C-alpha cells in the first residue's frame, strides 16, 4: 500500500510539474521571438544556462555526498526556488543580460531538481518499477502539459503581450508550487547513501556512450526548439500557431509514453524523429507544422525512455544521484551545443536541417553501440563503444573546463555592466543635485 501511494504521489507531482513546465518553457522561446529577439540573441540567452546546467550536473556527479544527508530538504528547496525563478522571466524582457542571468539561475535550480527527483525515483523503486513509474510520470506530465498548452493558447489569443505573459507565468507559478506542497508530503527518503566502490569499466563505457547519444539527440532537439518559432514567424504564422505546436506535441507525448518498448523500438523512434526534424524546413504551410509537432513528440519519447532504461540498469553500480546527473547533464550539453551552433547559423532553415543531421548521427551511434539492438555483433558493439567513450570523454572534459571559463567571463561581464550602470546613475544624480 505504501509503495502504491509513493507511485501515485510521484506521478501526481509530474502532473503538476507538466502544467507548470509547458507554460514556462513552452512560452519562453516564442516570447523572445515575438518580443523582437533574433535567433542569435535567443542563442546567447541560452548559452550561460547550458553552462550552468553542465556545471551543476558535474558537481553533483563528482560529490553526491553533498546531498545525501539532507536529500529531501534539498529537493523541496530547489523545487520551490526553481518555480520562483521562472516566474520572474517575463518581467525582464527589456534587459537581455539580466534575463540571461535569471534564465541561467532558473535552469540551474531546474537541473538540480531534475537530478534529485530522478535519484528519488531510483531510491524509492527498483527494477521494472522505475520504468513503470517513469512511463506514467511521462504520460501524466504530457497530459497536464496539454492542459497547460490549451490555457496558453487561449490566453495568448485573448490577451495582448506582455499582459498575457504575466498572467500565464503567474498561473504556472501557482500550479508549480502545488506540486512542491505535494512533494513535501511524499515519503521521499530524508537521506540516502550512495556506493563508494569504484565503477567497473563496462559500466563507465555504457553510461558514457549513452550520455553521448542523448547529448546529440538533445542538441538536435534544442536546435529545433530555437529555430521553429523564428521559422514560423518568417512564414507569417500568428503567435497562436506557434503556441499550438505544444498542444499536439503533448498529445504525442502522452501516446509516445506507451508506444515504445525495448531498445529496438527506442532506436526506431530516434530514426523517425531525425527524418521528421530535417523535413520541417521544407513544409511551407504553417498549419501543417502542428501535425508535425505531434509526430516529433511521439517519436522523441523513445529517446527519453532509452536514457531512463540504460541508467535504471546501472544506477545500483554508479549510484542513484550520479545516474540521474548523467541523464540530466545530457540535456544541458545538448543545449550548449545547440546554442553555440545557432549563434553562428542565422537561418532557421539551416538550423533545422543540421538538427536533423545531428540526430541522425546519434541514431547511427546507437545502432552500432547499444548491444541489445546493434546492427553489428555484441562484442564488436562493445569495442566500438569503448573507442567512442574514450574519444567523447576527452570532449566532455574540454566542455566542462570551457564551461567554467565561459561562466566566469559571463559573470565578470555582467558585474562590469552593473558597475557601469551604477556609476551612470550616480553621475545623473550628482548632476541633478548641483542643478546642471
Question: What residue spans do the PLM features occupy?
Answer:
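Juxtamembrane intracellular "pre-TM" segments in multi-pass secondary transporters
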Residues: 1-7, 187-214, 382-410
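Helix-loop boundary and gating motifs at the non-cytosolic
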Residues: 1-55, 204-246, 404-435
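Substrate-agnostic recognition of the 12-TM MFS/MFS-like secondary transporter fold
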Residues: 9-29, 45-61, 75-82, 102-160, ...
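Cytoplasmic membrane-interface "Motif A"-like loop-to-helix N-cap segments
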Residues: 65-80, 261-273
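A membrane-interface helix-boundary motif in multi-pass transporters
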Residues: 154-174, 343-361, 402-414, 429-436
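C-terminal membrane-cytosol helix-exit motif in multi-pass small-molecule transporters
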Residues: 173-192, 363-373
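C-terminal transmembrane helical hairpin of 12-TM major facilitator-type secondary transporters
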Residues: 266-304
Amino acid at each position: 500500500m505504501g509503495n502504491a501511494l509513493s507511485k501515485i504521489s510521484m506521478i501526481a507531482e509530474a502532473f503538476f510539474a507538466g502544467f507548470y513546465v509547458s507554460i514556462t518553457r513552452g512560452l519562453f522561446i516564442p516570447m523572445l521571438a515575438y518580443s523582437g529577439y533574433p535567433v542569435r540573441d535567443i542563442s546567447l540567452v541560452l548559452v550561460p544556462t547550458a553552462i550552468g546546467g553542465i556545471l551543476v550536473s558535474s558537481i553533483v556527479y563528482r560529490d553526491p555526498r553533498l546531498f545525501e544527508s539532507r536529500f529531501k530538504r534539498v529537493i523541496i528547496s530547489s523545487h520551490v526556488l526553481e518555480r520562483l525563478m521562472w516566474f520572474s522571466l517575463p518581467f525582464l524582457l527589456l534587459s537581455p543580460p539580466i534575463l540571461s542571468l535569471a534564465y541561467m539561475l532558473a535552469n540551474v535550480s531546474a537541473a538540480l531538481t531534475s537530478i534529485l527527483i530522478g535519484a528519488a525515483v531510483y531510491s524509492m523503486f527498483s527494477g521494472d518499477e522505475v520504468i513503470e513509474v517513469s512511463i506514467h510520470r511521462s504520460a501524466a506530465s504530457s497530459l497536464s502539459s496539454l492542459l497547460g498548452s490549451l490555457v496558453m493558447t487561449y490566453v495568448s489569443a485573448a490577451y495582448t503581450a506582455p499582459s498575457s505573459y504575466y498572467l500565464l507565468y503567474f498561473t504556472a507559478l501557482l500550479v508549480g508550487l502545488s506540486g512542491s506542497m505535494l512533494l513535501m508530503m511524499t515519503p521521499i527518503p530524508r537521506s540516502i547513501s550512495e556506493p563508494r566502490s569504484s565503477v567497473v569499466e563496462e559500466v563507465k563505457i555504457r553510461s558514457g556512450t549513452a550520455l553521448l547519444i542523448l547529448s546529440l539527440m538533445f542538441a538536435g532537439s534544442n536546435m529545433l526548439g530555437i529555430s521553429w518559432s523564428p521559422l514560423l514567424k518568417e512564414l507569417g504564422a500568428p503567435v497562436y500557431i506557434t503556441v499550438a505546436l505544444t498542444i499536439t506535441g503533448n498529445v504525442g507525448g502522452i501516446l509516445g509514453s506507451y508506444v515504445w518498448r525495448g531498445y529496438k523500438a527506442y532506436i526506431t523512434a530516434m530514426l523517425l524523429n531525425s527524418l521528421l526534424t530535417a523535413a520541417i524546413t521544407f513544409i511551407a504551410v504553417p498549419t501543417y507544422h502542428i501535425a508535425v509537432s505531434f509526430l516529433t513528440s511521439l517519436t522523441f519519447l523513445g529517446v527519453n525512455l532509452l536514457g531512463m532504461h540504460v541508467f535504471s540498469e546501472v544506477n545500483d553500480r554508479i549510484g542513484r544521484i550520479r545516474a540521474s546527473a548523467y541523464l540530466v547533464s545530457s540535456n544541458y550539453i545538448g543545449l550548449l551545443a545547440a546554442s553555440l551552433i545557432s549563434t553562428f547559423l542565422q537561418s532557421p532553415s539551416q538550423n533545422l536541417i543540421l538538427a536533423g543531421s545531428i540526430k541522425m548521427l546519434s541514431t547511427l551511434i546507437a545502432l552500432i553501440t547499444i548491444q541489445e539492438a546493434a546492427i553489428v555483433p555484441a562484442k564488436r558493439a562493445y569495442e566500438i563503444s569503448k573507442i567512442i567513450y574514450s574519444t567523447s570523454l576527452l570532449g566532455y572534459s574540454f566542455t566542462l573546463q570551457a564551461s567554467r571559463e565561459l561562466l566566469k567571463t559571463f559573470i565578470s561581464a555582467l558585474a562590469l555592466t552593473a558597475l557601469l550602470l551604477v556609476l551612470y546613475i550616480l553621475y545623473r544624480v550628482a548632476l541633478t543635485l548641483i542643478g546642471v
